[in-house]
Amino acid sequence: MIMKNLFITLIATFISVVTFAQKPDPNFHIYLCIGQSNMEAGARPAEQDKDFNDPRFSFIAAVDMPSMNRKMGEWYTAVPPICREGNNMGPVDFFGRKMIEVLPEHIKVGVINVSVAGAKIELWDKNDYKEYIDNERDWMKAIVEQYDGNPYQRLVEMARIAQKDGVIKGILMHQGESNSEDPLWPERVKKIYDNLCKDLKLNPKETPLLAGELKYEEQDGVCWRFNRDIMPRLPEVLPNAHIISALGCESTGDQFHFSTEGMRLLGYRYADKMLELQGFKEVEERTLTLDTKKLGIEISPTLAGIFFEDINQSVDGGISAQLIQNNSFQAYNVPFNTDSDEFSKVDTVFFGWTIINKEGTGKARTVNDRPLVKDLKPLYDFDPDDEYDDSKKYQQYSVRFDVEDPGQGFGIAANGFGISEYVRGWGNKGMYSNNTQIPSIPVEKDVTYDLGLYLTGDSYSGSFSVYLEDKDGQVNSNVITISNIGNDWKKYEGTLKAERSVDSRLCIVADAAGTFYLDFVTLVPEASQLWMEGKYGPFRKDLLQALADLNPTFMRFPGGCASEGTDYWGQVFWKNSIGPVEERIGFRNHWGYWTSQYIGFYEYLLMAESLGATPLPVFNNGVTCQFAGHKYVAPLDTQEDRDRFQSIFVDDVLDFIEFCNGGVNTEWGAKRAAMGHPEPFNLKYVGIGNENRGEAFWDRFDIIYKAVKATYPEIIIVSTSGAADAGREFDENMKKIDELYPDTIVDEHYYKGDDWFYTNGDRYAQGMKRGAQGNTYDRSKPTRVFVGEFANNRTNNAYASTLAEAAYWTSLERNSDMVVMAAYAPLFCKKGYNKWNSNLIWFDNRGMWRSTNYYYQKLFSVAGDRAFEMTPAMEGAVADSTVYMSPTIDTETGEIFIKFVNSECVNKTFTVNIGNKKVYNVSVEFISSFDTKVKNQGDQNYYSSHPDYNKVPSFGGPGAAERPGLREMAWRFAPKVKYTEAIVPHTKEYRKVKKSFDFIMPENSVGIIRLTPAK
């Protein structure tokens, strides 16, 4: 009896132990994972990922992995691969690692990953999977066969094993590329979700499904519309579904897959959401309350504008659509700069041109004894007795050819605006525009190009062939033949149609011996390629469209320092830039390269008009750039000096005002009309000087100021506070303005770093001290501020600079009763020509990259006409100091605009209390990036004409020349430049709202909320 009772006790104990062993551990959280190739995992581990071996994160092998001694149905520490052999890392890996990093140490995480590359969602449909897979590709069938032909069933089987050890807490999914145009995808997902809940006895209310977005368009994703059009319906169909953003997740470079860092960020976002749902991560909640009845200041209607300066090769080779560099051969003519690396030093080297000699003999050189324009009249009365030989400004150069034997052709080729290597400064090599020998004219297939050139001869009897040619000497267009050129200059015109989209050069080749001259060669794309089809001048279409998208209200031009010049020869005189292009006087500009003035002041006025922007020209006042050594100051010592100053510098401003606003019966108004614009340009502003200081400047400023006020009292003059935001120069200039020129708009410039922009948001607030003299920005006085140049220039347009600048911009708008204008600087930079490392728009010969600074300027370019009262972003009873905002309202339409910056890497859920009973349509447009080091323009050496991207790809092997298509294939796989931008705006539309609405302010974001009254 005793033995029997002991046996029963032992049996009961055994049963109890077994029962206890089989009881699931509530602290072992299990997640089911399905999807396509990104979920399957193809990212190579980074160095930081390789030593992971924490048993708190494990997985059940859903297939055998014999090479790793892993058996299906058993648990292993989650050392990749965790899906199948041959995989790497994916979002599931990073999800689990982030989870155990945040969760209490007693909680473990397990995953089951049954994903199949390329598969439609139908593969996980327990009823219809077989019909789907039977019609799929063999390689996919082979993957599915590892799951015994039924991935859904394998997932359920593995989940049941897992349920013996832990508790299923959710489902992770990344699928959709193969269903990217399937409007029923949300319903298909719900069906699978419902089946899993039923088969595994899961409570849907306690089992969230997290679905990750696909690659965005800016990451070259081809399925981005799925994120916009289909995926948002999933939470509507499946209430416990949550969308995980892929915004900013880095790409591998193909159309579908994320890189390791992209996978990491996506996996962390899955984890953040799951932790939030489980209460392990605090939801960042904020409130915002509007009171549109309490109106504030009037918002300056001219606050957002642009500053266009000829810097970084912005004009020739930039906004100018004329494709021939040094088209008039004047770039040889650079007085006082013959030692410059950037210009030809001898008359047989042609800046940007290459001699063509096909087995012939001859010579070519620049000469100035055969001027294209006879009796070119100087428009300024320069002193003939001073140290400068002003006749050099007006010398005209052409190329003389003396052909002894043409061989197969003797002539010259224009290479366009390319680059070549040169040594800058202290032995530093750079890529610049010196004597470009690389064919760099960016022609497009089937586009026609309007050709113009001038020829004359000394009884020359031969003909010329004009055509496009690629770097391999292959003709890339039709051939224009010119004959019987005569002994007088004559313009020849024609059209060339490109056969291939390859960088080319323009060849002008003679076929006979003799002497002839060539001058003023132009090549301009057909009207369809020009801004507004050329109606407003020969401007490059894409670059001007980018400016138009900024909605600029004013345009300052042509500088900056470029308006002053570094020395006597670099001064800008507008009269030399108008009239027939053949008569315009080029010069070496402040930034060290040749300015042809093919785009002159008249074209700048047209440009501003086409953009809907008020022109704001800046004039040289006889003091060259003081930062560049103060090399020239126009003399005022004698009456003759003063008269000459009047005729050159004072009259230059007065005559330009007449050119812009005068009637057609005035001298300069008539010239405007003759150029095709009888209507006035309605000039309102004139800038005198730039970042100037000291007595020499203010004496000359005073003369011009008084002359303009006496003749055109309606014109508003822009003065200057100098080159810094504070300091002795700033204080002295502001004192001078306070005392003598209070009716001017003072132009302030500053280039700073993140901290300055974040901490100076109250710079223009009422009552704040201005400089060291104790004065304030007093609204009761007429002086107003133009922030004519500003930028966060410490990080080369990294996204961090955008967050800081945008935060500062909200303060400019909040104080736009004082700050009436503001403009980022510089506006443009051509890659390979950068004189400045932070620029709003980067471009090359074929495309552009808009910086994230550009995009916040675009988002913030719209506003209402009045500010109104709004609470700060409140976190409970405390204002969030990392959120910067500016609210305005259009008092006529009732539309509300709220600009915002979230400078913290945290998503914040806002409840916005509108404060009235109206119904609104709400949209939020924003940019955001987890990584604040991202630069939209990428590497400085990443552009189309750079040698690394402009090589002839190698191909060869036996019979290579006879193999058609081999060359084309080599080009196809050669390195190419892409014009994608990592960070671009996205829009979230809301249904009609009333009284209040919720929205998520993304991490590190800049955006604008628009509330439009519903009709």
Question: What do these predicted ranges mean?
Answer:
Residues 80-89, 140-148, 176-183, 257, ...:
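The substrate-binding groove and active-site-proximal loops of carbohydrate-active enzymes
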Residues 283-596, 614, 631-644, 695, ...:
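Extracellular and organelle-lumenal recognition/adhesion modules and their flexible linkers in secreted
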Residues 148-166, 496-499, 503-507, 532-552, ...:
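An active-site-proximal structural segment forming one wall of the substrate-binding cleft
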